[in-house]
Amino acid sequence: MKHNMQILQELAAKNGPLCVGLDTDPSYIPESILKTFKSPAEAVLEYNRQLIKKIADDKSACCFKVQIAYYEAMGLEGIKVYAETLKLVKESGLICISDIKRGDIAATAGAYARAHFTGDFETDIITINPYMGFDTLKPFTEYCTKAGKGIFVLLRTSNPGMVDIEQKELKDGGRVLDQVGNELKRISQEMKATYPDQTCSPVGAVVGCTEESDAKALRDAYKDIYFLIPGYGAQGGDAKICGTLMKEAGGTVNSSRGILCAWKKDAGCTAKVENGTVAMSDIVEAAAKAAIASKEDLLRF
């Protein structure tokens, strides 16, 4: 059995390293289109449906990352759209990363693991916050072993506030993120041993591409760990930094707003928005073009 991180690594080699983030806020859809649907959640689902199909057909990405918060913000209907979006990604043949960033005591973590690795919200890979301790990872890694699931653990994030904790120096030397990384390396190696015939571990790391200064050092320190790389595009990270982070075991580079809101920089779309003739297919086409351009940009490195 191949685990999902291995499948993702292989899809990235085949389709390119782009991950399309489905952080689909209703405000990312033109008002004139929103008005044609019964609810904002219904409009979001249709945008996701058309975009997932187009991206899969174009082979411009290896996976989708679905940020649960945007769906929770739409209430019960939004949660239903979240579940339906996960199914649409699964049907596309690409990997689904659920960006849930869960982290809690082991008993609660077990409930989170069941919630997102089985049932209505079942997904391929999830993001995990390790800051309540590494024992909180065990319920998730158990699913990596028995069901081929994968996890990305926060290591060096892409937000400016990461300096508040991740970059803090420890009295015994090194930074907080280095201590997290060393433990993550140990866990990743243990998990890799359960899949000796595969080229990566089901345990990966989230490493943002907004800081060039330590990109090479991080890649060198964690050569055998597959990276989820946020921060490309709207957050200011560039393809050169991504190229450094994608070396060794590799990685997938996420872009969300840069793709979902690409219509705002498309002259044809903005003209149609102004005269009230823009259709969902127009903003999907703009997003698809942005995905192809992002893939080509990333492949330069």
What are the residue ranges of the model-derived segments?
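Conserved N-terminal beta1-alpha1 strand-loop-helix module at the mouth
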Residues: M1-V66, Y71-E84, K90-E91, A279-L299
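Acidic (Asp/Glu)-rich catalytic clusters
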Residues: A12-A13, I52-K59, L86-E91, T141-A147, ...
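Short, well-ordered coil/turn segments that N-cap beta-strands
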Residues: K14-L18, K59-C62, S92-L94, E122-D124, ...
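Conserved, mostly hydrophobic/aromatic
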Residues: V20, F64, D99, I126, ...
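N-terminal active-site wall of soluble small-molecule enzyme domains
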Residues: D57-C62, V66-G119, M162, E211-A215
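Conserved anion-binding
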Residues: I100, D104-G204
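A C-terminal functional module that forms or caps the active site or interfaces directly
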Residues: A205, C209-N254, G258-G268
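C-terminal helical cap(s) of enzyme catalytic domains, especially alpha/beta-barrels
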Residues: C242-M246, C261-F301
